[in-house]
Amino acid sequence: MAERRKIKTEKGLALVPGANKLSDGYNFVLEVPEGSNASLVLYKKRARKPFVEIPFTEENRTGNMYALAIPDFKSEDYEYNFMVDGKVYTDPCAYRILGRERFGAAADSDPHKVRCGFLKNEVFDWENDRNPQVPYYEMVLYKLHVRGYTKANRSIRGVKGTFQALEEMIPYWKELGINTIELMPAYEFMESGIASDPTTAGMVSEKRTEGRVNFWGYIPGYYFAPKRSYCATDDPEKEFKTLIKKLHQAGIACIMEMYFPKESNPVVTLRALQFWKLYYHVDGFHVLGEGVPTELLMHDAILSDTKLMFHDFNEDQVIRKKNPAGKCIAQYNPGFLQDMRCFLKSDEDMVGAAAYR
């Protein structure tokens, strides 16, 4: 209780989910199902056990949102999680996820191992960064997986499979004539489940799912945090910003794939895209999944000059501009890519399909 009294709290503002800086402190906001109990768990930086747990009260509730403010909060000294009905809950709107530095590592049995970090209050020198503004009719797009693309590349001098390693590929892309790259999910996602039972290791079972790794990332994710295991440094924000800056200096745009399942909150989806555009200077998004609020994204003023690629949308919703370079909405049709892959592999009955494309 002595530790509890060290943390002064106030009622927060239930507008923006996650942990966000105020003029004189930090605001913590969490959506909680009706009837559930929740609390904020704070850890001293790199400490194994929680420093303090602060319950949300009815005073902190607005609808299904809990909001709690901590004045004079020094975020550089802390990490955090939430607790919902007695279980540790990692903030889905966290800007940094800690404890997932090694790709494919099984989830730790300690629920406090994975936790959330805060945005750094450091100024990044963008050096007058500008969006390349590559129109669709001039786009030569190169799609890649951040880890898989450079992991086996012997020419990479730095840490392979990282954002930093992609910087070394820029001269190669320029030589190919590439002016846009598309990153498969590069935000944080939990690629591994719980650790598999060592007593059954090596046994074949069609029903076995433990220990498998989701390499691609087309699952629900932490949409505001660059994937930590794709980083060569311990500063994901700076590393990703540096990649974008160097791409732009070379005249190459960056499109991010974002996957949203059916149950996704459309407001969080919109805010995630706005955040990557404003904070990381991303040029556009290939938005996938059954939970895509297409109309909401297309009519957002912040995203009005941002490339948005959907697999399907109502064309009547699109505001067509006279300047072709200003057309930002596109239908992403992978048919050509799939047919040509099969044709180049000499799959059967692909000559007609390739000719049609």
Annotated model-derived regions:
Residues 140-142, 181-183, 254-256, 285, ...:
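Hydrophobic faces of well-ordered beta-strands that scaffold small-molecule active sites
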Residues 107-113, 281, 294, 298-357:
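Conserved alpha/beta catalytic core and glycan-binding cleft of carbohydrate-active enzymes
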Residues 168-186:
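Catalytic domains of carbohydrate-active enzymes, especially glycoside hydrolases
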Residues 155-162, 193-249, 253, 260-282:
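Aromatic- and acidic-residue-enriched carbohydrate-binding clefts of CAZyme catalytic domains
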Residues 1-25, 50-53, 60-145, 150-157, ...:
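The feature marks proteins involved in alpha-glucan
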Residues 80, 84-129, 191-226, 250, ...:
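Core domains of carbohydrate- and sulfate-ester-processing enzymes
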Residues 30, 144, 183, 223, ...:
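Conserved, mostly hydrophobic/aromatic
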Residues 31-37:
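Short proline/glycine-enriched turn/loop motifs at strand-loop junctions of beta-rich domains
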